[in-house]
Amino acid sequence: MPTVLGLETSCDESAAAVLRQEGDQLTVLSHGIASQVEEHAQWGGVVPEIASRRHVEALPNLVEHALKDAGLIAADLDAIAATVAPGLVGALMVGSITGRTLAALHQKPFLAVHHLEAHLASVFLADQPPKAPYLVLLVSGGHTELIRVDQRGEMKRLGRSHDDAAGEAFDKVARLMGLGYPGGPAIQAIAVEGDAKRFRLPKGRVSKPEGGFYPYDFSFSGLKTAVLRHVEALKRESEELPLADLAASFEQIVADVLVERSLRCCLEQGIDQLVMVGGVAANQRLRSLMHAVGQSKGVSVHIAPLAYCTDNAAMVAVAALRRLSSGVKSSSLELGVSARWPLEKALSLYGSTPPF
């Protein structure tokens, strides 16, 4: 029954969680998050220096409460895991140094976790997790990717955004509309009352050099520009902005694009299971549409529980537990952090020779 303490500090959420695994059963013994959303909202986005400072302040208390709520002491743990890449370097260092220090102090294995692998692992906290092979739609503030996971756990990216991630587009459009930060929850809140068919917005596509389009890739920068033009035109006409209709139209087109390309990829690649994870996976319109269209096309859809869509430490612990189950022993205590590191190289985070 391995028990792992997970730490997450890759961006603006400080988190600590303790999870235990018995066979295929995962139990969240404790799970705490200290959000910085309100502090960063006044700046319209995450300020890295502030984020790092708040992690330093919050993480020790989160670790203390995670162990206390789980009814454990550090000696009871089998391993300690922390996110080390990708993310804000200063923020990542707080979690990594904390995790490595605790591991050294209590003589426990340290597992360095890739942030995107942790998001992929979040679906295993659902009641009915998938069985490989499956396709993952990772959709968040920093990433929009389609990733195939095979029976051996190997990952291959089949599609990606060439500019803004979907979550980034939500933030930018919300700012254009004066809705504040973070954009996803703000847009969802008012879109409920809006007419999603009022404004025609583009489904951005990515052209191939030889002609045609990449079928599984995404582009959201043009969509953001289209919303801006509608806003400017309405202001020139001295009309009150129909915020609910704009929000609903934008939210619907993003959901349509994500669902259409994800399921097309499944069908053309012969995959009958789709996993959706990441912060944008919390969007209710997207969740409902993905389930409905997936069912109509014979694709089983698995979505991370709402509580574990945005950045959290439970998903870090799950990723670590899955690595332990696969035979991984530990990561080097000399391993640093990296702002960028491809998901395909996540396995390099384990072993005696650190990649950075």
Curated annotation (Swiss-Prot):
Its EC number is 2.3.1.234. GO terms for biological process: tRNA threonylcarbamoyladenosine modification. Substrate binds at L138, V139, S140, G141, G142, D171, G184, N283. Pfam families: TsaD. Its main location: cytoplasm. One of its GO terms (cellular component) is cytoplasm. Its cofactor is Fe(2+). One of its GO terms (molecular function) is iron ion binding. Keywords: Acyltransferase, Cytoplasm, Iron, Metal-binding, Transferase, tRNA processing. Fe cation binds at H115, H119, D311. It is found in: Cytoplasm. Binds 1 Fe(2+) ion per subunit. It catalyses: L-threonylcarbamoyladenylate + adenosine(37) in tRNA = N(6)-L-threonylcarbamoyladenosine(37) in tRNA + AMP + H(+). HAMAP family: TsaD (MF_01445). PANTHER family: TRNA N6-ADENOSINE THREONYLCARBAMOYLTRANSFERASE, TRNA N6-ADENOSINE THREONYLCARBAMOYLTRANSFERASE, MITOCHONDRIAL. Belongs to the KAE1 / TsaD family. NCBIfam families: gcp_kae1 (TIGR00329), T6A_TsaD_YgjD (TIGR03723). This is tRNA N6-adenosine threonylcarbamoyltransferase. It comes from Synechococcus sp. (strain CC9311).
